[in-house]
Regions:
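Short glycine-/small-residue-rich Rossmann-like dinucleotide-binding loops
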Residues: 85, 91-92, 111-112, 236, ...
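Rossmann-like adenosine-cofactor binding region
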Residues: 225-306
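Glycine/serine-rich phosphate-binding loop and adjoining beta1-alpha1 elements at the start
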Residues: 2, 8-11, 18, 24, ...
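Adenosine-phosphate binding glycine-rich loop
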Residues: 134-176, 284, 289-383
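An N-terminal-biased, well-structured beta-alpha scaffold segment characteristic
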Residues: 5-10, 14-122, 126
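Glycine-rich phosphate/diphosphate-binding loop of Rossmann-like nucleotide-binding domains
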Residues: 22-61, 168-255
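Residue-level detector of alpha-helix initiation sites
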Residues: 92, 152, 193-194
Length: 383
């Protein structure tokens, strides 16, 4: 059960922590969860930082840079998991890492539990505490630890979509921006949040015809103000169907915090789409907003259903590891330092936003959306 409420008098740090940074093992994942500057700050606060050998290479960061910052380079991944009070990662624990999770260990990473019941149950069984980047919500209702990767994924979705519209990739053979005398591609973006907005910016830059659908009229007004050359439409079942018929490239960009993405495109809709059209479902890590979505990898990123190309890579930002690592660590490192310096309970007590990131604690689901998704008992986290 969640810990009981308690008072924390002001004062120095409660105790030092051992913070572990393992190398990411998800397919073609090149990000790392901590920069050398973050390791230095943790060390200066009295914590010990263990970094797996080669963890930063995919982002152009060498072991020597971590060592200069005071981190200890460890060759054995299992040793890091065994010694660390807090594990900082980028992607959710992979099956090979399930046995390494342990009681009372803090796991600070992206989880996206709603799309993965097995992961949810394994973390529950382990007794570890899951602090999820993607559900931390600030006072304005924003998701500050998800935003940078949503920006990257939104921009990448157009890059990848443009590539797979090419004929050698089984696409329609269309240049996204067209050329003089030839019309450009029609890009339909489902969702006008961070992903959708960034996708639209890039698509407009390419010269495509862009339509964004959202069910928030205020958001549509905002998008119309900042991108007057983009068509904004209120999202409903009929409008989505009408737009799918016209689309060359569809971007799935919907999000419900902590929950599975709503299904907006059904299997039957694919038969109305153009042969060789492309769907990039950025919502795949929350289950996807297309009925035919299934997770793919950078190694084997696409598949075809009813002559429509599906690109459903669940870790798109991992392909641009250097950009993504710096963007991610800029926002996650302050929270990692705070948790390490104060302990999770004190940090959550002092920061009323932090409990929103705590999804699992002491074998209990502490996020309502995750509990509802799998029919599990929900208990709010109380620091």
């Amino acid at each position: 059960m969640p810990s009981s409420s308690r008072r924390y008098p002001p004062g120095a740090k409660l105790r030092s922590m051992i913070v572990g940074v393992p190398r990411e093992i998800k397919s073609h994942e090149y990000r790392v969860a901590l920069l050398p500057v973050g390791a230095d700050e943790l060390r200066r606060s009295g914590n010990q930082v263990l970094v797996e050998r080669g963890a930063g290479l995919g982002s152009g960061i060498h072991d020597e840079q971590y060592e200069k910052a005071g981190a200890i380079i460890v060759a054995d991944r299992a040793e890091i998991w065994a010694r660390a009070d807090m594990i900082i990662k980028v992607k959710e624990p992979q099956p090979d890492e399930f046995p390494l999770m342990r009681e009372n260990q803090i796991l600070f990473t992206y989880f996206h539990f709603a799309a993965d019941e097995e992961l949810t149950r394994r973390v529950l069984e382990s007794g570890a505490t899951a602090v999820a980047y993607e559900t931390l919500q600030d006072r304005q209702g924003r998701l500050p630890l998800l935003t940078p990767m949503s920006e990257v994924a939104g921009r990448m979705s157009i890059q990848e979509g443009a590539k797979y519209l090419e004929r050698p990739e089984e696409g329609r053979g269309i240049l996204l921006g067209g050329v003089p005398g030839v019309e450009p591609a029609h890009v339909v973006i489902l969702g006008g949040g961070i992903v959708g907005t960034n996708a639209a910016k890039v698509a407009v830059g390419f010269g495509a015809n862009v339509t964004i659908l959202d069910n928030n009229v205020d958001r549509l007004r905002y998008l119309d103000d900042i991108m007057p050359n983009v068509t904004t439409l209120f999202s409903d079942r009929h409008t989505i169907r009408d737009q799918l018929v016209l689309a060359d490239l569809v971007i799935g960009a919907v999000l419900i915090r902590g929950a599975r993405a709503p299904r907006l495109v059904e299997r039957a809709d694919l038969k109305t789409m153009k042969s060789g059209a492309v769907i990039v479902d950025v919502a795949v890590d929350q289950g996807g907003c297309v009925e035919t979505t299934r997770p793919t990898t950078h190694e084997d990123p696409t598949y075809i259903v009813d002559e429509v190309v599906h690109y459903c890579v669940a870790n798109m930002p991992g392909a641009v590891g250097r950009t993504s690592t710096y963007a991610l660590c800029n926002v996650t490192a302050p929270y990692a330092v705070r948790i390490a310096n104060l302990g999770l309970a004190r940090a959550a007590h002092d920061d009323p936003c932090l409990p929103s990131a705590i999804n699992i604690h002491q074998r209990t689901v502490t996020d309502q959306a995750v509990a509802r998704t799998f029919g599990l008992t929900f208990h709010p986290y109380v620091p």
